[in-house]
Amino acid sequence: MSRVRMDLFTSIDGFTPADQTPDNPMGEDWSRLTAAYTATRTFREKIFGDTSGRGTTGVDDRYGAAFFDGIGAEIMGAGMFGLHAHPTDSDWTGWWGPNPPFHTPVYVLTHSAPRPSIAMEGGTTFHFRDAAIDDVLREARDAAGGLDVRIGGGYGTARAALDAGLVDDLHLMIAPVFLGRGHRLWDDLSGFDTTHTVTSEVAESGVIHVTLTR
């Protein structure tokens, strides 16, 4: 059976950003958490289409490459798609551009569903669902064709999946920064170390990669 995967960025004091706006959908603190990842060769190639070979290699790049492997479907929240930027515009196709980096079916959790599905370049099709995350996960598994399902952000979607015990493989990228504000990822959520095997590795950038595998 396909596995449910999640990759999360967090600060060393356990925060994820909570300052998103329509003009800055990831929040001001997002770039501080993701600086090492966005500098990698894999990110530059997969997200920006840069095939020059520029970008960092090493531990961060190895985890970055694994991020894209074996994914057959994605689940994300409305904020990660960008619905909050143009909530009433039925022609809005999200802020990922004409060729999003997913290349799979993507299920967007939103209370504004039903909305028509949107087929993009490169194989990405956005489907909009107003349903519990475990129900949408069943649909995503069917669409994944035996490959894994990744649950993306934002914070609310990630916490819903963690609270429901849906995540088989969790990869935490802990940036060596203190935010002092935002969403506290682990409040009232415990026991992952008893249900998942925990490993950690420190990258050259100082980012701590923690993996929890069921």
Feature locations, PLM:
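Enzymes that bind and transform nitrogen-containing heteroaromatic metabolites
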Residues: 1-214
